[in-house]
UniProtKB/Swiss-Prot annotation:
The protein's name in its UniProt record: Prostaglandin F synthase 1
Catalytic activity: prostaglandin F2alpha + NADP(+) = prostaglandin D2 + NADPH + H(+)
Active site per database record: 55
Mod. after translation: The N-terminus is blocked.
Biological role: Catalyzes the reduction of PGD(2) and PGH(2) to PGF(2 alpha) and a stereoisomer, respectively. It has a broad substrate specificity and also reduces other carbonyl compounds.
Signal sequence, renumbered to the chain: none
Source organism: Bos taurus (Bovine)
Length: 323
Protein backbone atom coordinates (compact mmCIF):
# COMPACT_ATOMS: atom_id res chain seq x y z
CA UNK A 1 0.00 0.00 0.00
CA UNK A 2 1.42 3.36 -1.00
CA UNK A 3 1.46 5.64 2.04
CA UNK A 4 1.47 8.73 -0.19
CA UNK A 5 -2.07 7.93 -1.34
CA UNK A 6 -3.27 7.47 2.22
CA UNK A 7 -5.02 10.81 2.43
CA UNK A 8 -8.37 12.08 3.64
CA UNK A 9 -10.27 14.90 1.95
CA UNK A 10 -10.92 17.90 4.20
CA UNK A 11 -14.17 19.88 4.01
CA UNK A 12 -12.37 22.69 2.13
CA UNK A 13 -11.16 20.37 -0.66
CA UNK A 14 -7.56 19.95 0.50
CA UNK A 15 -6.16 16.53 1.44
CA UNK A 16 -4.47 15.50 4.69
CA UNK A 17 -2.27 12.37 4.95
CA UNK A 18 -3.78 10.00 7.54
CA UNK A 19 -0.43 9.38 9.23
CA UNK A 20 1.41 12.38 10.60
CA UNK A 21 4.81 12.87 12.20
CA UNK A 22 4.55 14.62 15.58
CA UNK A 23 7.49 16.83 16.57
CA UNK A 24 6.73 17.74 20.19
CA UNK A 25 9.52 16.90 22.63
CA UNK A 26 10.13 17.88 26.27
CA UNK A 27 12.28 20.99 26.71
CA UNK A 28 15.38 19.06 27.75
CA UNK A 29 15.57 17.34 24.34
CA UNK A 30 18.03 19.30 22.12
CA UNK A 31 16.24 21.10 19.27
CA UNK A 32 18.74 19.59 16.80
CA UNK A 33 17.01 16.24 17.36
CA UNK A 34 13.81 17.65 15.84
CA UNK A 35 15.82 18.56 12.73
CA UNK A 36 17.35 15.09 12.31
CA UNK A 37 14.16 13.21 13.18
CA UNK A 38 12.00 15.25 10.78
CA UNK A 39 14.50 14.76 7.94
CA UNK A 40 14.54 11.02 8.60
CA UNK A 41 10.73 10.86 8.83
CA UNK A 42 10.42 12.48 5.39
CA UNK A 43 13.06 10.09 4.00
CA UNK A 44 11.09 7.02 5.14
CA UNK A 45 7.81 8.33 3.72
CA UNK A 46 6.06 10.65 6.17
CA UNK A 47 4.37 13.47 4.27
CA UNK A 48 2.44 15.08 7.12
CA UNK A 49 4.43 16.97 9.77
CA UNK A 50 2.81 18.43 12.88
CA UNK A 51 4.40 21.15 15.00
CA UNK A 52 3.42 24.31 16.88
CA UNK A 53 4.78 27.64 18.01
CA UNK A 54 4.70 26.27 21.58
CA UNK A 55 7.20 23.51 20.70
CA UNK A 56 9.88 26.11 19.93
CA UNK A 57 11.32 23.93 17.18
CA UNK A 58 9.74 25.36 14.03
CA UNK A 59 13.10 26.69 12.91
CA UNK A 60 14.56 23.16 12.94
CA UNK A 61 11.45 21.51 11.50
CA UNK A 62 11.33 24.09 8.70
CA UNK A 63 15.00 23.50 8.00
CA UNK A 64 14.36 19.75 7.75
CA UNK A 65 11.49 20.25 5.29
CA UNK A 66 13.48 22.71 3.19
CA UNK A 67 16.53 20.44 3.06
CA UNK A 68 14.38 17.53 1.84
CA UNK A 69 12.91 19.81 -0.83
CA UNK A 70 16.40 21.02 -1.81
CA UNK A 71 17.77 17.48 -2.21
CA UNK A 72 14.82 16.42 -4.37
CA UNK A 73 13.23 13.96 -1.91
CA UNK A 74 9.95 15.92 -1.97
CA UNK A 75 8.34 19.02 -3.44
CA UNK A 76 6.74 21.58 -1.13
CA UNK A 77 3.28 20.48 -2.26
CA UNK A 78 4.02 16.88 -1.18
CA UNK A 79 4.36 18.00 2.44
CA UNK A 80 1.37 18.74 4.66
CA UNK A 81 2.60 20.96 7.47
CA UNK A 82 0.54 21.94 10.52
CA UNK A 83 1.29 24.77 12.92
CA UNK A 84 -0.71 25.95 15.92
CA UNK A 85 -1.75 29.28 17.38
CA UNK A 86 -0.73 29.34 21.05
CA UNK A 87 -3.08 30.41 23.87
CA UNK A 88 -1.38 33.78 24.46
CA UNK A 89 -2.30 34.93 20.94
CA UNK A 90 -6.04 34.26 20.75
CA UNK A 91 -6.93 37.98 20.62
CA UNK A 92 -7.97 38.53 16.97
CA UNK A 93 -5.31 41.18 16.26
CA UNK A 94 -2.56 38.78 17.44
CA UNK A 95 -3.50 35.88 15.17
CA UNK A 96 -1.91 36.93 11.88
CA UNK A 97 1.33 38.19 13.53
CA UNK A 98 1.60 34.81 15.33
CA UNK A 99 1.23 32.89 12.07
CA UNK A 100 3.70 35.22 10.34
CA UNK A 101 6.18 34.55 13.16
CA UNK A 102 5.81 30.80 12.60
CA UNK A 103 6.32 31.24 8.85
CA UNK A 104 9.40 33.34 9.52
CA UNK A 105 10.83 30.63 11.80
CA UNK A 106 9.98 27.93 9.27
CA UNK A 107 11.14 30.02 6.30
CA UNK A 108 8.12 28.75 4.40
CA UNK A 109 5.60 30.82 2.41
CA UNK A 110 2.54 29.09 3.82
CA UNK A 111 1.45 26.33 6.19
CA UNK A 112 -1.05 23.69 5.10
CA UNK A 113 -3.04 23.83 8.31
CA UNK A 114 -3.19 26.41 11.10
CA UNK A 115 -5.14 25.47 14.20
CA UNK A 116 -6.10 27.06 17.51
CA UNK A 117 -3.93 25.03 19.94
CA UNK A 118 -6.46 25.23 22.78
CA UNK A 119 -9.62 27.21 23.57
CA UNK A 120 -8.12 28.35 26.89
CA UNK A 121 -6.88 31.89 26.26
CA UNK A 122 -3.92 33.15 28.30
CA UNK A 123 -2.63 36.65 28.92
CA UNK A 124 -0.89 38.03 25.81
CA UNK A 125 2.85 38.64 25.99
CA UNK A 126 6.10 36.80 25.45
CA UNK A 127 5.50 34.22 28.20
CA UNK A 128 4.05 30.95 26.89
CA UNK A 129 2.63 30.14 30.30
CA UNK A 130 1.96 33.43 32.16
CA UNK A 131 1.55 32.84 35.91
CA UNK A 132 0.79 35.07 38.89
CA UNK A 133 2.81 35.08 42.16
CA UNK A 134 0.93 32.05 43.46
CA UNK A 135 1.78 30.05 40.33
CA UNK A 136 -1.73 30.20 38.87
CA UNK A 137 -2.17 30.70 35.12
CA UNK A 138 -3.18 34.22 34.10
CA UNK A 139 -6.25 33.79 31.91
CA UNK A 140 -7.42 36.08 29.14
CA UNK A 141 -10.99 36.58 27.99
CA UNK A 142 -11.57 36.15 24.25
CA UNK A 143 -14.58 35.33 22.11
CA UNK A 144 -13.39 32.26 20.16
CA UNK A 145 -15.64 33.30 17.25
CA UNK A 146 -13.54 36.45 16.87
CA UNK A 147 -10.34 34.38 16.97
CA UNK A 148 -11.87 32.17 14.28
CA UNK A 149 -12.65 35.16 12.04
CA UNK A 150 -8.97 36.14 12.25
CA UNK A 151 -8.01 32.60 11.13
CA UNK A 152 -10.42 32.88 8.20
CA UNK A 153 -8.59 36.05 7.13
CA UNK A 154 -5.24 34.19 7.29
CA UNK A 155 -6.67 31.57 4.94
CA UNK A 156 -7.95 34.26 2.57
CA UNK A 157 -4.50 35.88 2.63
CA UNK A 158 -2.90 32.58 1.54
CA UNK A 159 -0.80 32.21 4.71
CA UNK A 160 -2.48 28.87 5.42
CA UNK A 161 -4.38 26.51 3.12
CA UNK A 162 -6.72 25.19 5.81
CA UNK A 163 -7.83 26.19 9.31
CA UNK A 164 -8.94 24.11 12.26
CA UNK A 165 -9.00 23.72 16.02
CA UNK A 166 -7.50 21.57 18.75
CA UNK A 167 -8.71 20.50 22.21
CA UNK A 168 -12.25 21.80 21.52
CA UNK A 169 -15.28 20.01 22.94
CA UNK A 170 -18.43 19.58 20.83
CA UNK A 171 -20.10 22.67 22.34
CA UNK A 172 -17.13 24.85 21.40
CA UNK A 173 -17.21 23.39 17.88
CA UNK A 174 -20.93 24.10 17.70
CA UNK A 175 -20.30 27.70 18.68
CA UNK A 176 -18.02 28.14 15.64
CA UNK A 177 -20.29 26.12 13.31
CA UNK A 178 -23.34 28.21 14.29
CA UNK A 179 -21.51 31.54 14.08
CA UNK A 180 -23.41 34.08 11.96
CA UNK A 181 -21.48 34.80 8.77
CA UNK A 182 -19.22 31.74 9.09
CA UNK A 183 -16.98 31.65 6.03
CA UNK A 184 -15.03 28.41 6.60
CA UNK A 185 -15.80 25.48 8.87
CA UNK A 186 -12.93 24.06 10.92
CA UNK A 187 -11.44 21.23 8.85
CA UNK A 188 -10.28 19.32 11.92
CA UNK A 189 -10.28 19.03 15.69
CA UNK A 190 -6.97 17.70 16.99
CA UNK A 191 -7.48 16.00 20.35
CA UNK A 192 -5.94 13.42 22.64
CA UNK A 193 -7.22 10.08 21.38
CA UNK A 194 -6.12 6.50 22.09
CA UNK A 195 -7.70 3.20 23.19
CA UNK A 196 -8.08 4.46 26.80
CA UNK A 197 -9.79 7.66 25.55
CA UNK A 198 -11.31 6.71 22.23
CA UNK A 199 -13.44 9.87 21.85
CA UNK A 200 -16.23 7.89 20.16
CA UNK A 201 -18.89 10.56 20.81
CA UNK A 202 -16.68 13.43 19.68
CA UNK A 203 -15.62 11.40 16.62
CA UNK A 204 -19.27 10.80 15.72
CA UNK A 205 -20.04 14.51 16.19
CA UNK A 206 -17.07 15.55 14.02
CA UNK A 207 -17.94 13.06 11.27
CA UNK A 208 -21.53 14.36 11.19
CA UNK A 209 -20.16 17.85 10.45
CA UNK A 210 -17.45 16.70 8.01
CA UNK A 211 -14.70 17.63 10.47
CA UNK A 212 -11.69 15.31 10.64
CA UNK A 213 -10.59 14.12 14.07
CA UNK A 214 -6.79 14.20 14.41
CA UNK A 215 -5.37 12.11 17.25
CA UNK A 216 -2.44 13.21 19.39
CA UNK A 217 -1.03 11.09 22.24
CA UNK A 218 -2.24 8.11 20.18
CA UNK A 219 0.20 5.88 22.09
CA UNK A 220 -0.67 7.34 25.48
CA UNK A 221 1.97 9.69 26.88
CA UNK A 222 5.40 9.84 28.39
CA UNK A 223 4.54 10.35 32.03
CA UNK A 224 7.30 12.91 32.60
CA UNK A 225 5.85 15.99 30.93
CA UNK A 226 4.52 18.78 33.15
CA UNK A 227 1.24 18.61 31.20
CA UNK A 228 0.70 14.93 31.95
CA UNK A 229 -1.29 13.29 34.72
CA UNK A 230 1.25 10.69 35.83
CA UNK A 231 -1.14 8.51 37.86
CA UNK A 232 -2.40 6.86 34.70
CA UNK A 233 -1.60 3.31 33.52
CA UNK A 234 0.79 2.81 30.60
CA UNK A 235 -1.30 2.22 27.47
CA UNK A 236 1.26 0.18 25.51
CA UNK A 237 1.47 -2.39 28.31
CA UNK A 238 -2.24 -3.17 28.05
CA UNK A 239 -2.71 -6.98 27.86
CA UNK A 240 -5.49 -6.80 25.23
CA UNK A 241 -3.40 -4.53 23.01
CA UNK A 242 -0.35 -6.78 23.49
CA UNK A 243 -2.33 -9.92 22.62
CA UNK A 244 -3.68 -8.39 19.40
CA UNK A 245 -0.17 -7.19 18.52
CA UNK A 246 1.24 -10.68 19.05
CA UNK A 247 -1.46 -12.22 16.86
CA UNK A 248 -0.59 -9.87 13.98
CA UNK A 249 3.17 -10.04 14.66
CA UNK A 250 3.16 -6.25 15.15
CA UNK A 251 4.02 -3.98 18.09
CA UNK A 252 1.33 -2.67 20.47
CA UNK A 253 2.20 0.84 19.21
CA UNK A 254 1.40 -0.13 15.61
CA UNK A 255 -1.88 -1.70 16.69
CA UNK A 256 -2.83 1.54 18.51
CA UNK A 257 -2.01 3.57 15.38
CA UNK A 258 -3.80 1.16 13.02
CA UNK A 259 -6.90 1.29 15.24
CA UNK A 260 -7.20 5.03 14.53
CA UNK A 261 -6.58 4.69 10.79
CA UNK A 262 -9.40 2.13 10.52
CA UNK A 263 -11.80 4.43 12.42
CA UNK A 264 -11.18 7.23 9.92
CA UNK A 265 -9.06 9.20 12.37
CA UNK A 266 -5.91 11.02 11.22
CA UNK A 267 -3.20 9.88 13.61
CA UNK A 268 0.04 11.52 14.74
CA UNK A 269 3.00 9.29 15.59
CA UNK A 270 5.62 10.98 17.71
CA UNK A 271 9.09 9.51 18.06
CA UNK A 272 12.63 10.78 17.54
CA UNK A 273 13.93 7.19 17.52
CA UNK A 274 14.86 6.19 13.94
CA UNK A 275 13.88 2.55 14.36
CA UNK A 276 10.44 3.52 15.66
CA UNK A 277 9.92 6.29 13.08
CA UNK A 278 10.50 3.72 10.34
CA UNK A 279 8.38 1.12 12.11
CA UNK A 280 5.42 3.53 12.38
CA UNK A 281 5.21 3.61 8.57
CA UNK A 282 4.19 -0.07 8.71
CA UNK A 283 0.74 0.97 9.91
CA UNK A 284 -0.41 0.47 6.28
CA UNK A 285 0.97 -3.08 6.03
CA UNK A 286 -1.67 -4.95 8.03
CA UNK A 287 -5.34 -4.81 8.95
CA UNK A 288 -7.19 -5.34 12.22
CA UNK A 289 -10.27 -7.59 12.15
CA UNK A 290 -13.70 -6.32 13.22
CA UNK A 291 -13.21 -8.43 16.39
CA UNK A 292 -9.88 -6.71 17.08
CA UNK A 293 -11.50 -3.30 16.63
CA UNK A 294 -14.32 -4.25 18.99
CA UNK A 295 -11.87 -5.50 21.60
CA UNK A 296 -9.87 -2.25 21.40
CA UNK A 297 -13.10 -0.21 21.59
CA UNK A 298 -13.75 -2.07 24.84
CA UNK A 299 -10.57 -0.67 26.40
CA UNK A 300 -11.98 2.85 26.64
CA UNK A 301 -11.92 4.19 30.21
CA UNK A 302 -11.91 7.92 29.54
CA UNK A 303 -8.36 8.29 30.79
CA UNK A 304 -6.94 11.64 29.79
CA UNK A 305 -3.15 11.95 30.00
CA UNK A 306 -3.11 15.63 29.00
CA UNK A 307 -5.88 16.95 31.25
CA UNK A 308 -4.46 20.49 31.43
CA UNK A 309 -5.66 20.84 35.02
CA UNK A 310 -4.09 24.28 35.32
CA UNK A 311 -6.75 25.50 32.91
CA UNK A 312 -9.64 24.49 35.18
CA UNK A 313 -11.65 27.58 36.09
CA UNK A 314 -11.25 29.18 32.66
CA UNK A 315 -14.69 29.76 31.07
CA UNK A 316 -13.49 27.86 27.98
CA UNK A 317 -11.82 24.95 29.83
CA UNK A 318 -12.81 22.18 27.40
CA UNK A 319 -12.71 18.98 29.43
CA UNK A 320 -15.57 19.55 31.88
CA UNK A 321 -17.96 18.44 29.13
CA UNK A 322 -18.45 14.73 28.52
CA UNK A 323 -17.17 15.19 24.94
Amino acid sequence: MDPKSQRVKLNDGHFIPVLGFGTYAPEEVPKSEALEATKFAIEVGFRHVDSAHLYQNEEQVGQAIRSKIADGTVKREDIFYTSKLWCNSLQPELVRPALEKSLQNLQLDYVDLYIIHSPVSLKPGNKFVPKDESGKLIFDSVDLCHTWEALEKCKDAGLTKSIGVSNFNHKQLEKILNKPGLKYKPVCNQVECHPYLNQSKLLEFCKSHDIVLVAYAALGAQLLSEWVNSNNPVLLEDPVLCAIAKKHKQTPALVALRYQVQRGVVVLAKSFNKKRIKENMQVFDFELTPEDMKAIDGLNRNIRYYDFQKGIGHPEYPFSEEY
